[in-house]
């Protein structure tokens, strides 16, 4: 049996500003708008909490461990309410925020289903909070990504009639009932590209239009925002029509950093165990190795959290580096981006040059989370990888949030007494 002791090469620098440097520049610009104190050692910035009250509050649904929410928090939004039905995910949300010194949401955490927010006692609380904030002149936004296996190619594909598919309808019903000033709806590309699911998606948009929303949508790829991952998702954004200018001014591309990411001459496969130098003419900051280095995955608190192979090491030692075309076992390439971070349905992502599955720390890096983000040590491996795989990649979430922020600042009119 051969021994794999390959050490990663150090990434070469590219002429394009790194994701780290761009984040530093954005942090400097947003220094007074962030809702918590965070020290980013890579930037040497100390970002202090803003004292005055915000003009926008976010209510989060299907929150998971809060990847989407973190993108909004680091863009200057306040999270006011968090709803998640799965207890381990909600505990991970709370834990990660406590480790990053992020304040608790104004209206707290709610462990329960979206339907409880729509019909049960919690529905009264939610309606009252939204109404009160809007009457006080606060802009209220709903964000969420309903569970998507019923629309996914890899899922059971039951569509709107599946238990998960029904949650998309519930989320839209919740929006229509509570009338937030704007909303974000995130889902898999299957909802947008598959004909029978597209019909349901269009019906949801018609319902939103009937309740006063003007909407814009885009099939995004997370890699264009700096995420080391080829991950397409449909994003639907809507605004109450009486408050907004023409949506042609909503610039989806404003915070895209790598529009030509997939056009580069990326490496394909290498014999496992070889020392592989970084190729020229790629974006190093979109590679798996760059993010492993950036996040210090070997010393991260979740570094040891990975599944042990059931059949020993032999299979892991025969799959070529970069061979990610197989249905189940996919070995990442250190100098390429990852395929979609989906760790269910018997899909196994193998470390580029070590004979094991990737760790939770490495999966978080592939989802572009800040290195300060960590999951609780007592969380099961299954729950760790499920919440990581389900989450919206952080830099994509941040790019969408920044686009929304720019639009709200420049094209949104709000009066103090409306929204009653």
UniProtKB/Swiss-Prot annotation:
EC number: 2.1.1.37
Gene3D superfamilies the UniProt entry points to: DNA Methylase, subunit A, domain 2, Vaccinia Virus protein VP39
InterPro entries listed in its UniProt record: C5-Methyltransferase, C5_MeTfrase, SAM-dependent_MTases_sf
PROSITE patterns: SAM_MT_C5
GO MF terms held by the record: DNA (cytosine-5-)-methyltransferase activity; DNA binding
Catalytic reaction list: a 2'-deoxycytidine in DNA + S-adenosyl-L-methionine = a 5-methyl-2'-deoxycytidine in DNA + S-adenosyl-L-homocysteine + H(+)
Enzyme class: transferase
Top-level taxon of origin: Bacteria
Family membership: Belongs to the class I-like SAM-binding methyltransferase superfamily. C5-methyltransferase family.
Active site (catalytic residues): 148
Alphabetical keyword list: DNA-binding, Methyltransferase, Restriction system, S-adenosyl-L-methionine, Transferase
Pfam families xrefs: DNA_methylase
Entries under NCBIfam families matching the protein: dcm
Protein name: Type II methyltransferase M.NmeDI
A Gene Ontology biological process term: negative regulation of gene expression via chromosomal CpG island methylation
Domain SAM-dependent MTase C5-type residue range list: 56-411
Chain intervals for the UniProt region annotation (Disordered): 1-23
């Amino acid at each position: 049996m051969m021994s794999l002791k390959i050490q990663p090469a150090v990434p070469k620098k590219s002429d394009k500003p790194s994701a780290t440097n761009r984040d530093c520049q954005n942090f400097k610009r947003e220094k007074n708008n962030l809702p918590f104190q965070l020290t980013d050692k890579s930037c040497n910035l100390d970002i202090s909490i803003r004292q005055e009250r915000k003009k926008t509050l976010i209510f989060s649904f299907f929150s998971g461990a809060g990847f989407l929410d973190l993108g909004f928090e680091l863009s200057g939004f306040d999270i006011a309410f968090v709803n998640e039905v799965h207890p381990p995910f909600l505990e991970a949300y709370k834990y990660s925020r406590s480790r990053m010194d992020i304040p608790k949401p104004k209206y707290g955490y709610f462990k329960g289903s979206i339907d409880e927010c729509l019909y049960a006692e919690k529905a009264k609380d939610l309606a009252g909070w939204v109404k009160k904030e809007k009457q006080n002149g606060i802009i209220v936004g709903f964000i969420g990504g309903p569970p998507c296996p019923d629309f996914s190619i890899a899922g059971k594909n039951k569509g709107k009639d599946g238990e998960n598919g029904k949650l998309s309808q519930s989320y839209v019903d919740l929006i229509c009932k509570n009338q937030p000033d704007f909303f974000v709806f995130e889902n898999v590309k299957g909802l947008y590209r598959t004909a029978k699911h597209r019909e349901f998606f269009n019906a949801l948009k018609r319902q939103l239009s009937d309740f006063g929303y003007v909407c814009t949508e885009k099939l995004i790829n997370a890699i264009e925002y700096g995420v080391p991952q080829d991950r397409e998702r449909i994003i639907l954004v809507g605004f109450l029509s009486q408050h907004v200018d023409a949506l042609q001014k909503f610039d989806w591309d404003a915070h895209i950093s790598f529009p030509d990411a997939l056009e580069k001459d990326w490496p394909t496969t290498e014999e496992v165990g070889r020392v592989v130098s970084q190729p020229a003419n790629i974006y190093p900051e979109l590679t798996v190795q760059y993010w492993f280095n950036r996040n210090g995955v070997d010393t991260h608190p979740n570094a040891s959290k990975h599944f042990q192979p059931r059949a020993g090491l032999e299979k892991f030692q025969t799959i070529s580096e970069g061979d990610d075309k197989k249905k189940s076992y996919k070995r990442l390439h250190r100098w390429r981006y990852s395929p979609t971070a989906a760790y269910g349905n018997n899909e196994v992502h193998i470390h580029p040059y070590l004979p094991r599955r990737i760790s939770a720390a490495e999966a978080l890096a592939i989802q572009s989370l800040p290195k300060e983000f960590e999951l609780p040590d007592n969380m099961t491996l299954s729950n760790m990888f499920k919440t990581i795989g389900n989450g919206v990649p952080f830099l994509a979430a941040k790019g969408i949030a920044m686009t929304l922020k720019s639009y709200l600042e420049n094209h949104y009119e709000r009066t103090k007494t409306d929204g009653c």
